[in-house]
Each structure stands twice: as C-alpha cells, then as structure tokens.
Regions:
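Alpha/beta-hydrolase superfamily serine-hydrolase fold, recognizing
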Residues: 1-197
Length: 197
C-alpha cells in the first residue's frame, strides 16, 4: 500500500493513508478477489512500525478487524533509550534512528506527548491486538524494543511469535538474502503466514 512519506508528510499522514486503504480493502476486497476474512498487515523497519501503529488504530477505532500483523524488525520506540538503540551497530546507528524519528514525528519529536499511534511502544494496553509475528537480529538497533514489545504482547494475551536471529543486523534479510540466517527468517515468515492464511 502506498502512503505519504515523512519528512514531507509527518505523522499522522502515512498512518491515516494506511487506515483508509485498509478500510477500503476490508469493505471492497471481494470485488478484487481478496478474502476479506483473512487480511493481515506488516512491513519491515519503519513499515513494521507503521503496521504496529495501524493495528493499534484499527483496534481503537473498532470499525473492522485485521487477522494478523507481521512486524519485521519494526521501528516502534521513539524514546531511543534501550541499550541496542544506542549501539553503533551496522546499518542503523543512533544518528539514523534520530533522523528517522525526527522526520516521522516532526514537531512532536522528543516530546512527552507522542501519541501511541505514532510510537506503538508507548501503548500500555496491548490487549485485543491480532496474532503477531515479530523478528529482529541481535545486532539490530531495534532488537531490545522489539523483544520488549513481543513480551508485552504475550503478557496481554496476544498470540505472539518472536524470532531473534543471532549476529543479524537491521535489514539482514534484504542485503544478505542468500545467508543461512536470512533463509531461516524467510522460512519462519512463510510458516507464520501459512498458519494465518
């Protein structure tokens, strides 16, 4: 799904675009051959964060439901206070994280008033979310926030799969697609999707 991108269009533009597109699909999907009873959302990195935020927004607005979320090393914690968020790790260093969040949040960056639909890790109530798949590598700046989010989902009663890949940095499944760890990640994703669909 296409949505307006930051920094030209900061929060909530992209999220509202995604919600509108998903709502259209739920209401009209059968006209284009989509089984509207089995729709999930997902994405990698900022797209994974957008998917997590979209799942919260869908739950909170209550107009329709989604069946699962697939969060691939999602960017979900704007506070950037975890240990891994401050490591100088390959691919996504602290400066990259600062740039990503400041671009997305605009004037809300480093504010105490960042909405949970902008930064899902801020949400205290994770009940009522759909079954969730989360993956991250141990060398990913988002590893700590993703692991913590998965644990919180699990404690909230959300069926949650967490996959952590040793030695894998952010985006490993793309730039190192032929490695054993990337093949394992694809296998884990496919198995989850097989169970959801």
């Amino acid at each position: 799904m296409q949505y307006r991108l930051a920094p030209e269009h900061p929060y909530p533009s992209g999220l509202e675009d995604s919600y509108s597109g998903l709502k259209w699909l739920k209401e009209n999907g059968e006209t284009v051959g989509v089984d509207t009873g089995r729709i999930g959302i997902g994405g990698p990195s900022a797209g994974g964060g957008m998917a997590a935020a979209l799942a919260l927004l869908v739950r909170d607005r209550g107009e329709f439901e989604i069946d699962y979320q697939l969060l691939i090393y999602p960017m979900i914690d704007d506070t950037r206070t975890t240990i891994t968020a401050n490591w100088d790790v390959p691919v996504w260093a602290p400066e990259s994280n600062d740039f990503g969040w400041s671009s997305y949040l605009g004037e809300l960056f480093e504010s105490d008033d960042v909405p949970v639909h902008a930064a899902p890790a801020r949400e205290s109530n994770l009940e009522g979310l759909p079954p969730t798949f989360i993956m991250a590598g141990t060398l990913d700046a988002f590893a700590d926030e993703d692991i913590a989010y998965a644990q919180r989902l699990n404690h909230a009663g959300v069926p949650t799969e967490l996959h952590v890949y040793p030695g894998a940095p952010h985006g490993f499944d793309g730039f190192a697609a032929s490695t054993a760890v990337a093949r394992q990640a694809r296998s884990d994703i496919n198995a989850f999707l097989g169970r959801m669909l």
